[in-house]
């Protein structure tokens, strides 16, 4: 048994003898000692002094006596907690001795069992002795996270998924305690997770740094429990001090248990909890699980960030000797900055060091670069800070300043406080005109580098497109002159050209919430201007300026009224300006005294510019503008309140109903972005005007046609036989009807990744899988043994189709198991069979093996010495479809072979071979010669790799996008490394030969 000395604490009791423990077990009411009550109050702690601090004018002895005589409530609470912890700690040792006594009472026949129990108790004892409080370094930071929720909330599955990466359906009634290492901003932290089995108590509320409230989206009771638990926690601790996260779990949602808590109610609860984020998670396939805990850790660290000291007005005080001083310290409570007074006995040296520390922190925080919106250094502020801290300093702060005649050293790097406060000469003050010109220039920190400067750029908030967690995130948005709108997470990502996304502007329009489309806004015009317009059509056309569809009405060459039009209104403006107004489908009442009417093709379009007759000057334009705004906002909400409610948002809508929501800082910035985007949309439409009449013969349309017609079985739904399916499952490689696609979505994306043939994007890897498998091949695997069950038809009910689909893909009832061979000739392992199928490019065998085996089979090695995996072999032969299938089924893209080469290195080698082959074929075609056909395969019938430039290039891009590392560098070893030829190195033979 290990040496066990936990009772070195002054409150500790002596160790009881085993016989005493045995006697206590027999007579539990004897020899029971009361809890220790001895407490030394002669030197109160800082925390205790803070709670009951006397005034600064009181003497030190009087203050100490007051604290001892009447301990405040925080001191009582801390004392009680300390005594309870001591009792808990001391109760372990007698219990362990009691277990040893009971083990000794076991008969000799059970000696082996007794020894096994003794060994386990020793392990428990060692773990207790070496617990975190005695062993871990003080420099290791910890994060305390609490998880609360009802028994059927799904919190245990959420924690289990985060810790293990797997799904556990059973709920743990007693909760649990867990530890995990997390990395945040490159720093390692010890995360302590406390899964509370019941309602939060006082101890739990005082322990946590953050709380996650969990409820199930299909259980009303778990949702109401969150309210009760939050109310109970509020009795023990201020909710404003604790970061909170609300999580709704989707694990129990099914056809029988539909969702009952909609998104609106959940977000209402999150807003009621204050400072609370809301997520919807699914522990079954890991949706948002990592994100929830990462956000909780970030919130804890944000709560702990020290706030810079706030400068207070100088209050002169008389320094005293060794007394109970008042040291200002930061109290980051409720997100507000403020100073509190901490009673603390200070010596003169400590007071002087403390004063210097606060002065340096204030100076460093006030000299940050102005681009970070921190004010310049103010010497008066520093003096006031010194005055505020002078109540604990024993020397005049002027004694710390250098002599007046001594010149300060000139720094060579960033300007310091002293350098900024030095007097400058008036000889080289820049002129005001140059300074104004310099201010007009854009700051270099606000512009991207490395590329041409876009038309418009800046930070906007973008709403997440995920339906489960629609939140606003700050993005760096750029509007390019080639008809693209790009956005990146930050300016640095834009400068590095990483993590960016783009929106092509050829087939989109821009809208502002709460406003009608810009082409449908109208200002009703005087009908008398119609004849003038037709007579002066050319002159009216000349007034179109300033961007897309901007209409300018010049009055006395000074007053102008501009109305921006949408793209749909541009065509009608041109028609109207040509001299003939377009007829409206709806009648409009005109007042007969107004200026211009602008609308789209559904109403009259009149344009009144600088009309030739100057006598027709109109004075009543402004009232119509107000009328137009009243029509635009027909509700009782004021026009100036509409912008506030909309939040200065605008959104871009594409032809396939995709939307990108953005939000600007104010209405002016939003209007600038909308106008700039409209201008680029107009330019993009003009640039493709000549190509509109051409036939649509793009690669995507050809690929879609090939998927429908060339792949066997794709003319009908894979599960019910409905004709002309329009939906697909990517990882299964099949087409299905819209009703079966809904069933596939309910299975989860880990079983079936559903996409639309006509609405979604189809990158090359997805197309290659669809072209390689198809409905006929997939059904030959997934329906190879239907056990005489009748397949539903297209007229069958949805319930019948769902039962068939779940039995087919989820339960895998119709699969034929892999053959084991005979005892004399056993079949290879599934991993070796998969390697064999990859080398032969046998798609059917690959689909069958992946369907029958767990994901670990995708990382099998060729042999003990040849550690190549199926993914490495697929990349070596440049097979894009097989590589994508393996990646979807859990293949490790970071695995390296025995020489440190990754799958990306193999893919690049295949790309080089494909490029060389293509160049050779092009040269032969230009020379008029023919390339001899390759010799038939001689190595067991293995087909020669057919390297294709498009497929290998797409494979390289796929691996790069997934973050696959480059080839690992060679490490020093005791033997010479093998030659690093790309594919010419003689590898060990696999089951079927050598690649």
From Swiss-Prot:
The gene is CenG1A. Residues 1-56, 308-340, 394-451, 576-599, 617-640, 970-995 are annotated as: Disordered. Residues 679-822 form the Arf-GAP domain. Residues 15-32, 42-56, 409-418 have a biased composition (Low complexity). Residues 1-14 have a biased composition (Basic residues). It comes from Drosophila melanogaster (Fruit fly). One of its GO terms (biological process) is medium-term memory. One of its GO terms (molecular function) is GTPase activity. This is Centaurin-gamma-1A. It comes from the Eukaryota.
